[in-house]
């Protein structure tokens, strides 16, 4: 039996006993993870409904992929940048395909468990009743402004002296 699973933004065709390298999944060597995002399952030429199916896998090792050279250049500007990148990978051995989702493995592949408790905590916090708002005090009438002092004419500047 085979299955198409999605993990790390990529899709993999797996069967029991296969070894695959996927984007990093939290866990140590020997841990069992469950890949719950099964897109398609089948047996030979027969395609089955993938709802409720999971794929269980064992983590073989946490490793890093080959170095990829990232070279940037802008012609005629003397601009060259060379960087390397090594992607973190997890090597998995597929144990079983098509188990029911009720089986609880040691670790879950999806990190959605952490997001749920935070949402519940936020929902519990606004349960307190809001304090009643006080009525605004009535506005006082503005006091009339004192009449401005008598205006004086602007001082005149002395004329520049003439050279003889």
Curated annotation (Swiss-Prot):
GO terms for cellular component: cytoplasm; ribonucleoprotein complex; ribosome. Residues 101-164 are annotated as: Disordered. One of its GO terms (molecular function) is structural constituent of ribosome. InterPro entries: bL21-like (IPR028909), bL21-like_sf (IPR036164), Ribosomal_bL21 (IPR001787). Keywords: Ribonucleoprotein, Ribosomal protein, RNA-binding, rRNA-binding. PANTHER family: 50S RIBOSOMAL PROTEIN L21, LARGE RIBOSOMAL SUBUNIT PROTEIN BL21M. This is Large ribosomal subunit protein bL21.
């Amino acid at each position: 039996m085979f299955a198409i699973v999605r993990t790390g933004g990529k899709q993999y065709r797996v069967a029991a006993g296969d070894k695959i390298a996927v984007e990093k999944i939290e866990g140590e060597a020997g841990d069992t993870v469950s890949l719950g995002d099964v897109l398609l399952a089948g047996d030979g030429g027969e395609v089955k409904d993938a709802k409720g199916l999971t794929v269980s896998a064992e983590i073989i090792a946490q490793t890093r992929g080959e170095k990829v050279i990232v070279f940037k250049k802008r012609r005629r500007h003397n601009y060259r940048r060379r960087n390397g990148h090594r992607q973190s990978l997890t090597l998995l051995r597929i144990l079983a395909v098509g188990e029911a989702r009720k089986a609880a493995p040691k670790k879950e592949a999806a990190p959605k468990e952490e997001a749920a408790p935070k949402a519940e905590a936020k929902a519990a916090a606004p349960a307190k009743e809001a304090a009643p708002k006080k009525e605004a005090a009535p506005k006082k009438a503005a006091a009339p402004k004192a009449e401005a002092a008598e205006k004086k004419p602007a001082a005149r500047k002395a004329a520049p002296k003439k050279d003889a």
